[in-house]
Amino acid sequence: MSNLFKITLLFLLITLGKPAATFAQTNAATKYKCMIQMTNYMGEGAYIVISLIDAKGAYEKTLYVMGPDKKWYNSLKEWNKFRAKKPANISAITGASVTGGDRSVNTIEIENSKMNAGYKLRFESAVEDKTYNVKDVEIPLTTEGLASKSEGTGYIRYVRFSPN
């Protein structure tokens, strides 16, 4: 009787475990190294936020924040509006700000289902007492987009991605 119970339990685990495994595969994510090279601007460290933008141009998710002091997040105006409407714990995806001429390498995680599906990565940048760049860099979230070097228009000189 004990063996019959064990076999039944094993059968149920295998049968019911398959949908969960399938669900986990559809929500799988890939980690990428993101290297940001800054221009040689003069001034304080730049606060930069990397956001996932949907096909309609709306913010969907914060992927990384460079700049640890929350009191300056309001300088990233468009992202801060999104954050106010849809608060999320970003402590695990927050790092140091980046100064002029420096580079930063961080790891970001992107859901595989978002690749080649009309999404973009937006890099917003702000420096104290200087211009705010809502779209310093915007990269199509495609295989080709992540494979190439993307030039910035503000404090960011360029961004490159590589598989982690």
Predicted regions mapped to residue ranges:
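Short, solvent-exposed aromatic-acidic interface loops
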Residues: 39, 63-70, 141-143, 158-162
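Glycine-rich, aromatic-bearing surface loops/beta-hairpins
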Residues: 110, 116-118, 125-164
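Bacterial Sec-dependent N-terminal signal peptides
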Residues: 1-28
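Contiguous beta-strand segments within globular domains
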Residues: 26-48, 54-56, 61
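Intrinsic-disorder/low-complexity, polar/charged segments enriched in Ser/Thr/Lys/Arg/Asp/Glu/Gln
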Residues: 29-33, 103-107, 136
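N-terminal, polar/charged subdomain of small-to-medium soluble alpha/beta proteins
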Residues: 53-56, 142-144
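Structured domain cores in non-transmembrane regions
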Residues: 55-118
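Conserved beta-strand and immediately adjacent loop positions that scaffold enzyme active sites
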Residues: 48-49, 122
